[in-house]
Amino acid sequence: MAVRPGLWPALLGIVLAAWLRGSGAQQSATVANPVPGANPDLLPHFLVEPEDVYIVKNKPVLLVCKAVPATQIFFKCNGEWVRQVDHVIERSTDGSSGLPTMEVRINVSRQQVEKVFGLEEYWCQCVAWSSSGTTKSQKAYIRIAYLRKNFEQEPLAKEVSLEQGIVLPCRPPEGIPPAEVEWLRNEDLVDPSLDPNVYITREHSLVVRQARLADTANYTCVAKNIVARRRSASAAVIVYVDGSWSPWSKWSACGLDCTHWRSRECSDPAPRNGGEECQGTDLDTRNCTSDLCVHTASGPEDVALYVGLIAVAVCLVLLLLVLILVYCRKKEGLDSDVADSSILTSGFQPVSIKPSKADNPHLLTIQPDLSTTTTTYQGSLCPRQDGPSPKFQLTNGHLLSPLGGGRHTLHHSSPTSEAEEFVSRLSTQNYFRSLPRGTSNMTYGTFNFLGGRLMIPNTGISLLIPPDAIPRGKIYEIYLTLHKPEDVRLPLAGCQTLLSPIVSCGPPGVLLTRPVILAMDHCGEPSPDSWSLRLKKQSCEGSWEDVLHLGEEAPSHLYYCQLEASACYVFTEQLGRFALVGEALSVAAAKRLKLLLFAPVACTSLEYNIRVYCLHDTHDALKEVVQLEKQLGGQLIQEPRVLHFKDSYHNLRLSIHDVPSSLWKSKLLVSYQEIPFYHIWNGTQRYLHCTFTLERVSPSTSDLACKLWVWQVEGDGQSFSINFNITKDTRFAELLALESEAGVPALVGPSAFKIPFLIRQKIISSLDPPCRRGADWRTLAQKLHLDSHLSFFASKPSPTAMILNLWEARHFPNGNLSQLAAAVAGLGQPDAGLFTVSEAEC
């Protein structure tokens, strides 16, 4: 049977559609030419064609085609037909021409694009059919968007003179689409259209044509595309001005001494920002011409004046000599105390007196003398034992235990003990007068090479100064401060959140030969797949810098952070201001919130307020709320609960239920209260809480029973069953008693450490050298579960010392020395004598 020629394209489209619908197979297609004799005006014409698009993260992209007239439209991607079931089709009729119109949409996923290997890019195009033939659309390329983290070139700090040109190079990270670059000056955007003195080159370098004093700032290169925004390290640019002399003044009148003078100042311009001072003198003196000089004989008044001036000068010189002598005497006394370290490292045990050096009679060891004075010193480096055995074995766990009293005696033959003076110098002093005076949030002390420890009670914040971290011969006053978030401006970008308190230790710039360990709590739920954690440090200019990206540590880094479930331990040789900041990588990232319910201890009115606090699950946040509630006269009415708050952008809701209407009436006008997501996630707002006000029907009502729910929308939640007597129920008051941390806020020398000094030294000397059988510091780290970053320990002169320091920071003051002794003894060292300490060594 003959078929009319005009029906062939339609039949071909129907057959092709039936084949795709039935088999779902993908095959190459041959596009037909227009049918001979057909009207070319009726070929499909595309109203919408697919365009190039980028896949961001894991979100699929949508491609759209629309053609008229069209009886069929199919997508072809990388030469293969897309299955019909993956097409979303809409048919309509063009209003003006009455021709059939078709619109087709498909989704392309990241997995489909990633299946294409090699140099070929993933592309898709549409093929439309009509009764007159077929038409192809343009190709649309689908690319996966990304932006690397590391800049190929970052700007470097510069010091330039006034009116000199400045070029700050910046090569952004590799990315698709290519990153756009902008520059920040002290966090303000640099706009070349507003400042003709600056421009940005095609290579993204920032150029300042002529440096001005106002150009002194921190410059940051920012790269961004549709995926992310990256910041380079800030580069400090200092524009300095060298000083120049002003013109000489006129000569002064001729004086009685037949001289006159003229002066000038280093003010044309004055040196700025570290510029060089003017060279030469600012005063010029010359003899006067003889006829201008007036000669007069010195009278009795002048002689008396000269004698008085000479007497004053002599007195000042004598006073200066006395002060120098007193200073040298004190310094000599302190050096004699510190120079013979056996007095300190032997635990102040008595040995025979003899001069230690022929040329220095001040260096003496100590001999027992029952007739002399005795000075007590808190702590010891070596435990004493009154039994007949002269040796201690480390393999017995109790040998690492401290003495009950922890006190040892130092015998000295002088009436005024040098040790007493030395210990008094190492005690805490009221020294840092310029620091915040909040006594509960600050501690400070004086330390030398023996080390020590600073603690802010009931906050989980401490600073461990290991032995030999301070150079011998140096004495530092060191402080430790907890800051309120509103007092310190910590900029948080994007989804970043503060996970720890903001803590300062200082003074900055002191020389340390070993890393100190800063311990502080955090409220993040550690998960490498959910969090990007960064340690931030404030620079001397006031800006915050990322000094460590957890999980990307390198042995050469100056910092290391041991992250645990609720605390972090920061190794640093540079003191300063630190904070732990997290950036959520997925909605699974969660912060721990502690929920606390408070109510008045005494209620004299009919109204009764229940305050629900939602705070970071850290000791310092708990301490602040407890102190606040003590001032308000509040009491805890339920045991605290922990809620996991996720980065889902959903708010926190609180509601109260099952209030007995015959006894109480709720004054809440809505069914629930909310705390906005960003108020919690930001982490810088304190005392976040909601108040539920209940009213007693009768003044005699004292029993309260209800339920209180706290939950994140589409997330975790907690419920409290409240059932207590508001006048006499205090069973939860004991939960408010803050744990008293052992010792004082500042511990100096041996009393700051659990491990006796000589035993510590023997462990270090035994485990530092590599051992073929594995009985070295690596095995000790594994036994103590400190093997997450062995390369950091290996980069230090004594890896064992780093491990023991971290153990001290984690376990003070309640560490189990028996477990440590068992771990060391279980290494199987062949020479047990390495862990033996004799009375002579003590």
From Swiss-Prot:
Q: Which domain of life is it from?
A: Eukaryota
Q: Where is the signal peptide?
A: 1-25
Where does the UniProt entry place glycosylation sites?
107, 218, 245, 248, 251, 287
Query: GO CC terms on record?
Result: membrane raft; neuron projection membrane; neuronal cell body membrane; plasma membrane
Share the record's PTM remark: Phosphorylated on cytoplasmic tyrosine residues. Phosphorylated by PKC in vitro. Proteolytically cleaved by caspases during apoptosis. The cleavage does not take place when the receptor is associated with netrin ligand. Its cleavage by caspases is required to induce apoptosis.
Main subcellular location of this protein, as a coarse class: membrane
Domain Ig-like per the UniProt entry, residue ranges: 44-141
Q: Which UniProt keywords apply?
A: Apoptosis, Cell membrane, Cell projection, Developmental protein, Disulfide bond, Glycoprotein, Immunoglobulin domain, Membrane, Phosphoprotein, Receptor, Signal, Transmembrane, Transmembrane helix
> Known Gene3D superfamilies for this protein?
2.60.220.30, Death Domain, Fas, Immunoglobulins, Thrombospondin type-1 (TSP1) repeat
Give the way it sits in the membrane.
Answer: Single-pass type I membrane protein
Q: Where is the Ig-like C2-type domain?
A: 155-234
Site residues by UniProt (Cleavage):
340-341
Which parts of the chain does the record assign to the membrane side Extracellular? 26-306
Q: Which InterPro entries is this protein grouped with?
A: DEATH-like_dom_sf, Death_dom, Death_UNC5A, Ig-like_dom, Ig-like_dom_sf, Ig-like_fold, Ig_I-set, Ig_sub
**Location in or out of the cell:** Cell membrane; Membrane raft; Cell projection, Neuron projection
**Positions of region (Interaction with DCC):** 605-623
Does this UniProt record's set of keywords contain Signal? yes
Q: Which PANTHER family match?
A: NETRIN RECEPTOR UNC5, NETRIN RECEPTOR UNC5A
Q: Which family does it belong to?
A: Belongs to the unc-5 family.
Further information in the entry reads: Down-regulated in multiple cancers including colorectal, breast, ovary, uterus, stomach, lung, or kidney cancers.
Q: How does it assemble?
A: Homodimer and homooligomer. Interacts with the cytoplasmic part of DCC. Interacts with MAGED1. Interacts with PRKCABP, possibly mediating some interaction with PKC. Interacts (via extracellular domain) with FLRT2 (via extracellular domain). Interacts (via extracellular domain) with FLRT3 (via extracellular domain).
What is the protein name for this chain?
Netrin receptor UNC5A
Coding gene? Answer: UNC5A
